[in-house]
Amino acid sequence: MNAVGIDVSKGKSMVAIMRPFGEIVSLPFEIKHTTSDINSLVELINSVEGESRIVMEHTGRYYEVLAHQLSEANLFVSAINPKLIKDFDNDSLRKVKSDKADAVKIARYALDKWQNLKQYNVMDELRNQLKTMNRQFGFYMKHKTAMKNNLIGILDQTYPGVNDYFDSPARSDGSQKWVDFASTYWHVDCVRKMSLNAFIDHYQNWCKRKKYNFSQSKAEEIYGKAKELVPVLPKDAITKLIIKQAVDQLNSASTTVESLRTLMNETASKLPEYSVVMAMKGVGTSLGPQLMAEIGDVSRFTHKSAITAFAGVDPGVNESGSYEQKSVPTSKRGSSDLRKTLFQVMDVLIKTHPQDDPVYQFLDKKRAQGKPYYVYMTAGANKFLRIYYGRVKEYLSS
């Protein structure tokens, strides 16, 4: 048995090959993440007598090139959580941290856990694309939030509270009514310098041009509030330029978010479990694809507890002797992106309260018992995942 430990970094990796009882087959050496170097590594591993298993840490996205190529070469590859490697066999007072030492440590881990190593599954291109899109979606959502807060901060100095006038959601092209309104009426003087009738006519024409619903009472309310507001920045070309730039940045981020949302739904609809997932309560065309992106292929989980552990919503255990802790925090060792999506699903269930849904009934029961927010939300996420696993696996097997 040959254990190949690979310490992965960006663009290159350190490789060590060992056998039981500390026998060194190959001293640590460096390879680049290029076709020629990877092919040379495959030839070296195949030339070593006996069964070989490759272990590496799944660090960011760096490991995927090696894991994919080595798996394609019909080699046994196992990608391990870095924390498991870090906590393994720390029996020395010396603190040695180098790529060579890490590669040897990973090889020793492979030998020790030989029977328990799980083989890396090459994710099909569709799921890989969906997961990449979801990560980009999360990135641009954060960017959009930052741009939104930036615009509100500037508008508070020219037209305080304008962002609260409308609560309509973003359109498919990313546009929002309050942003379009602030782009046109960027200063409070843009409204109150007109007469009431002139503003109503102007606002009505604006709604017609932008294809928004017009309400005369809303126009009168906006005009009345504008009369009482006190701006800080003057109504001049410089202030207008600052606001226009902030609006353009927000619209750009919002357009990207909505286009990704649409593309993710189109991509997810090609997966076999799409109809089952979309039929679940709390899941729509936005959260459904996000769930499928983060969970991936359900068949790789051997049982329900495996998928809850993957998400990090499984209950912890703290027992020693006669002591047994009754309430233990969840592990939170799994995918933080999946936990975030699950919490959003729970939030939708709480807001829509579908009485016939078992997950909502469970959430409502825990809330009635006086459980803290994070306790009942995490418990609901756990139950939702178990139901998700059961329904999807049953559908795929049929």
Segments predicted by a language model, with ranges:
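A detector of single, family-specific signature residues
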Residues: M1-S398
